[in-house]
Amino acid sequence: MIQQQTTDQYIKVCMKTWLLCEASVHAESTSTSPRHNLVKECSECAKACFAVVSRLVSNAGDLGDLVLNCLLHCRQCSNECEKYPGEEDIQFCGIVSSICADTLKEIAVHQLN
């Protein structure tokens, strides 16, 4: 089982990513010419992060494939965001998604042991 202090850290990182991805999805969806790949990747990342947070908050124990799924979607979101270097909000979303993916590696390694 993951220690509570560490669990809180994972929750904070995933929540921050979820919020930023949701904000990016909203901003893109309401723009005059939304970038559909960006909306898709940010939306999938947000859903995956929220699933991890929900499981961690409920103290359900086994995270199953949620961590690897989230790690994958965070990486894909980060890669998509990197395609728009002139846009600070999108770049920040990508950075936070990358940090989330790196942080979730710790849980993934812990689950393998």
Give residue spans per PLM region.
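Amphipathic alpha-helical hairpins
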Residues: 1-113
